[in-house]
Amino acid sequence: MAKKLYIKTHGCQMNEYDSSRMADVLRESHGLELTSDPEQAEVLLLNTCSVREKAQEKVFSQLGRWRQLKQSRPELVIGVGGCVASQEGETIRVRAPYVDLVFGPQTIHRLPAMLTQAKASSQPVVDLSFPEIEKFDKLPEPRAEGPTAFVSVMEGCSKYCSFCVVPYTRGEEISRPFDDVIAEIVGLAEQGVREITLLGQNVNAYRGSIGEGDTADLALLIHYVASIEGIERIRFTTSHPVEFSDSLIQAFAEVPALVSHLHLPVQSGSDRMLSLMKRGHTVLEYKAKLRKLRQVRPDISISSDFIVGLPGETEADFQATLALVDEVGFDHSFSFIYSPRPGTPAASLPDCTPIALKKERLAILQGRLRALEIAISRGMVDTVQQVLVERPSKKDPTMLAGRTANNRVVNFSASQDMVGQFVNIRITEALPNSLRGIVLDAKRRCA
């Protein structure tokens, strides 16, 4: 019987990608197969996020639950990776001394050697180095887990927004070579993948080397990905407004496979707050980019991220954010109360805003965003949407689920052998977090 590996993932899509690569590398080196039951595993890995304080505390809550498993099975190996590992380092073992492995986002390719060392020596192993692109050079070919896949094209961020810990935990921006990205996607397409999501902390800063000192930007990469046989949908995330270029907007005009959905975090509708956040752009510049984009893709869905309660935020600043939300008409978006991250410039700003007021503002903002999202969903009822059938529905395994081009989950009744096909679905109902529909026909079979 194959030995088992359990991975718990917190945070962003980049972490989901990293977790899949952890599974790939340990499957190849140690014959470990993924399990959904931690009690059946001999290795437990926690891939962490440190963007917000609550996410960080979730790490230690999870480790506390795993401690009981370690006490009953001392040979069990527990590892902590991701951004909390990078930020906290040895402190993790101070709070949870039963942890065997601590590794950063850039060292997951070293997991086989770390695991072997920990088992042989019964001593903890910590590797928080930043070996840049080496991570991708040493990882095995990815295994497709369905008709959609994430592909990391760059890591890190060099923007140093005042509130953000990512540059300190993921490092500076490093782009993968163009040919390496294309080769990975070709391999996934050969395994039946039909939709690719290109990932990066600041993905539109991608500048992949293509030989003789030349580089390819994200727009050029998208054009080439669209030409790969079998790839019929392309998404990318997460974007920074500063580098959302005219060439990328032109890609939306020229590449039909690039979906009509964009996640473009703005964080605030106030120029004063954007300056305090060190975002590098104004509200007017942000809106100008969206205006250009909508000229070439009138139906595009725009989602975003928002922070309320950054130290110094006034009522006028908050009202400016609400005004931007109404003007743009954002689709499903994420919003949070500012959480000070150690070592970031914003953490040292004086904060005189009561937490009760921050919570009130967040509730108002989320209510406004939710109303827009519901209106968009209801507007899709009685329309026909092309959906890539991804998997059985999470809520009802007798149904199937897939996503529309604008990133809506649709649940519908159909035969299981339709997974991997594009189908036309008439939307019949808008539910709080998904849509329901009926299949009209299969557009094409995905081999």
Swiss-Prot record:
Occurrences of domain TRAM (ranges): 378-441
Domain spans labelled Radical SAM core: 143-375
Molecular function terms from GO: 4 iron, 4 sulfur cluster binding; metal ion binding; N6-isopentenyladenosine methylthiotransferase activity
Keyword field contains Transmembrane: no
Keyword check for Metal-binding: yes
Protein localization: Cytoplasm
Annotated residues for binding of [4Fe-4S] cluster 1: 12, 49, 83
Chief location bin: cytoplasm
PROSITE patterns associated with the record: MTTASE_N, MTTASE_RADICAL, RADICAL_SAM, TRAM
Cellular component per GO, a single term: cytosol
Keywords: 4Fe-4S, Cytoplasm, Iron, Iron-sulfur, Metal-binding, S-adenosyl-L-methionine, Transferase, tRNA processing
Gene3D superfamilies: Methylthiotransferase, N-terminal domain, tm_1862 like domain
Known catalytic reactions: N(6)-dimethylallyladenosine(37) in tRNA + (sulfur carrier)-SH + AH2 + 2 S-adenosyl-L-methionine = 2-methylsulfanyl-N(6)-dimethylallyladenosine(37) in tRNA + (sulfur carrier)-H + 5'-deoxyadenosine + L-methionine + A + S-adenosyl-L-homocysteine + 2 H(+)
EC number from the UniProt entry: 2.8.4.3
MTTase N-terminal domain location: 3-120
UniProt-listed InterPro entries: Elp3/MiaA/NifB-like_rSAM, Methylthiotransferase, Methylthiotransferase_CS, Methylthiotransferase_N, Methylthiotransferase_N_sf, MiaB_methiolase, rSAM, rSAM_horseshoe
Function comment: Catalyzes the methylthiolation of N6-(dimethylallyl)adenosine (i(6)A), leading to the formation of 2-methylthio-N6-(dimethylallyl)adenosine (ms(2)i(6)A) at position 37 in tRNAs that read codons beginning with uridine.
Family affiliation: Belongs to the methylthiotransferase family. MiaB subfamily.
Record protein name field: tRNA-2-methylthio-N(6)-dimethylallyladenosine synthase
Species in which this protein is naturally found: Nitrosococcus oceani (strain ATCC 19707 / BCRC 17464 / JCM 30415 / NCIMB 11848 / C-107)
Gene this protein is translated from: miaB
